[in-house]
């Protein structure tokens, strides 16, 4: 009985570090009174768990000829840092899984339209995005 109590207490303590908050958000164009108050262009699913995050994003329309979509996590209002999550596949999907020291500092998921085989590490203009909700934005 004592061992079971110890396991329950340890399990409770370790749960204190667990942060979860799966969210599915619409990807919208910039505009309106909000950062992304325009037309719906796709969706993004974010599944954070402690120091890992899985992201699946889908764009409803293809990029322009000679262009490709790229996904980013952005720390808007903080460091202004943008982390590239890579290029969307030809079917319009981005599938990202990674370990991060603090994924919750990011406040937006954005999509840019980049030249195909782009060598510039900076992002082009944002074509769609979403404001992240808690536990993000900490």
State where each predicted segment sits.
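N-terminal targeting/export leaders
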Residues: 1-138
